[in-house]
A protein has these predicted regions:
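Conserved N-terminal alpha-helix of the aminotransferase class I/II PLP-enzyme fold
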Residues: 32-81, 86, 102-109
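N-terminal glycine-rich, Lys/His-bearing helix-loop that initiates the first secondary-structure elements
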Residues: 1-44
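Conserved PLP-enzyme active-site core in the AAT-like
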Residues: 9-11, 70-269, 274-275, 279-285
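Compositionally biased, intrinsically disordered low-complexity regions enriched in proline and serine
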Residues: 29, 34, 45-47, 142, ...
């Protein structure tokens, strides 16, 4: 049975695996785990490689994005840094020209030093993206909407373009969140999140996520994740989705909804799929 996004935000993966029957997932602070006996495992060995609380958050994010697996990182930049480890010297990426500064800094310094090149183009124009593809292009990286100029790309069309040339499509879904946009259902291979923003409310925690549907890609990323160690802290994991739960309260307080294609912006059909903003009532009834 598929649950609504609101239910997933509140209930998580709904897997009640706590041995003491806790309804809310406990925050497991331990670094290591005791096993029942020689050759017997609880499924957890060391918290860098796996933690019950972190696993619950990862499953919840995967469900929200309609992916199969997710990995929770200490920050959004840690997630992107780990993702770049799937590429090799000589590989080429195409990316949105209006992009978060931290991502650009990573590419212009560390990725460049490692022999990976990135060309930033106007990804709101599919033909411009197509013209930038080279034989060594391994991925197209979109922010849609972009940070900070809110440019929108056609995820489905660019996914088809990337796959036709043997590459993958990566989509940073931070600005819309899985509530409004699910790139994996439109053909993306990897979804990136800075969970610090809308998933958690931008006030309490730092986090990042990678979400995928392909098992081989997940295994590759999970190996990088366990090896490099930029995993999510246990206590911080416990605060994940407080912003999403707050959203359920705020939603009842909306006075007016704005749809970008109705307010003088480019009325191309692709705008209808992505952008929404709202006015909040002056007084919120509890």
């Amino acid at each position: 049975m598929a649950f609504a996004a609101e239910t997933i935000c509140v209930q998580g993966s709904n897997e009640r695996r706590d041995p003491f029957g806790a309804i809310s997932m406990p925050i497991y602070q331990n670094a290591a785990y005791a096993h029942p006996g020689l050759g017997q495992s609880t499924g957890y060995d060391y918290s860098r490689c796996g933690n019950p609380t972190r696993d619950e958050v990862q499953k919840t994010v995967a469900l929200l994005e309609q992916g199969t697996e997710a990995l929770a990182f200490s920050t959004g930049m840690a997630a992107i840094t780990a993702l770049m480890e799937i590429f090799f010297p000589g590989d080429h990426l195409i990316a949105t020209d209006d992009l978060y500064g931290g991502t650009l800094r990573l590419w212009n310094t560390i990725s460049h030093k490692n022999g990976i090149s990135v060309d930033c183009v106007d990804t709101s124009n599919v033909e411009t993206v197509k013209a930038a593809i080279r034989p060594e292009t391994k991925a197209i990286y979109l922010e849609t909407p972009s940070n900070p100029m809110m440019k929108v790309a056609d995820i489905q069309a660019i996914a088809e373009l990337a796959h036709a040339h043997g590459g993958i499509l990566i989509v940073d879904n931070t600005f819309l969140s899985p509530y409004f946009q699910k790139p994996l259902t439109l053909g993306a291979d990897v979804v990136v999140h800075s969970g610090t923003k809308y998933l958690e409310g931008h006030n309490d925690t730092l986090s990042g996520f990678l979400v995928v549907k392909d098992d081989a890609l997940y295994q590759q990323l999970n190996n990088i994740y366990k090896t490099t160690g930029a995993c999510r802290l246990r206590l911080i994991v416990g605060y994940c989705f407080e912003g999403s739960r707050l959203w359920l309260y705020v939603w009842s307080s909306i006075r007016k909804m704005l749809w970008r294609s109705h307010t003088g912006w480019n009325r191309d059909r692709k705008w209808r799929k992505y952008i929404i903003s709202v006015w909040i009532r002056d007084r919120i009834r509890r």
